[in-house]
């Protein structure tokens, strides 16, 4: 799931009502990963996960996606078939 915000900020995410673990990626305006949390379990609720720096997008994927695709901080992500978002 992709979350798109009007401006970059330190948006927090939690695992309330989730049934499975996920990876979370916070991306800047250019789609570059600025923070990530891997294999976040539903049992972490009510903890809230915040990026270290402001981000404009948050992408949630199945757990293990970051490891499988060697995604780390600084990795640029290209989202195919996504509309361009402008301010």
Please give the residue ranges for each predicted region.
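Compact, glycine-rich, soluble single-domain proteins
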Residues: 1-87
